[in-house]
Amino acid sequence: MGQVDAGFKQMMEMVNLSRLSNAMRAAGIMRRALLESLVHARGRAAFSGPLLALPLLRANVLEMLLDVEAAASVVFSSAAVFDRWNHGSAEDRQLFRILTPIAKCWITARARTVTSEAMNGRGGNGYIEEWVNARLVRDAYLGSIWEGATPIVALDVQRAIVREGCHEPLFAVIGGRLQRVTEPAAKPWVDLVLQSVESTRRRIDGWALLAREEAELEAKPAADQLYHLLAASLLLHEGQVLRDRVQDFRKLFVGALYVQRWLQPRDSSAPAFSARDLGWLDAIVAWSGLPASALRRPHA
């Protein structure tokens, strides 16, 4: 049954496993939503061509794809940490403690956006029950409520940081992955992530000086930022592995676009992606090999 004086802590370990399962479910829902959007956009013609040829729709699909690939990387890597901890790795317990609420907080909430965009892209057909989109939206909303609504889970991320210092092993893992990204064309993007890690660390260190109400307001932005740092490090590292094995720059490009979308400072009125970025969408979707020239330096 466990220790009498550690009931809540033991219960939270069970909840954390359930949260990982919930995040993985949401990642699968997002992938289905992306597939539905691609099938529709390729098959539906408008303005003398397929919908997927239109820049705004391509931008929506690309953003959905980034969300899907990042979520898959996060849940699978978190599951690997759980396996190590479950086989006796004490050092991974602290890491798993913060990974699960981070993943649950962002992925299940983001699934609401991705499924809604997929429904919107299909138009009126997406709203009616003859198509899968309406069910995907409902299921996405349910997932963000299970095992704690988003604000509650964000506060749990903050507790894991303040009470257990779980952000330190997380930052160490992120930094270790980024050190293994040796492709020169990816270095500017790696540097952007490392800069974001340091600014996030300073922000967290400043919580001790805040009143409780002010500190709690920091919980959700911090949880979101930690997710983006984790996801970016995973995508870039996976991209390095893919490049080393088959000289394919696809995943490095996806990682760079993720950093560009979520971590690089930009004018909020500017588009998230350039026409050049969108030009690679078909190759990314098809998992065709991308050349090194796909990677470019971040905008100043």
Regions found by a protein language model. Name each.
Residues 1-300:
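Flavin-dependent oxidoreductase catalytic core characteristic
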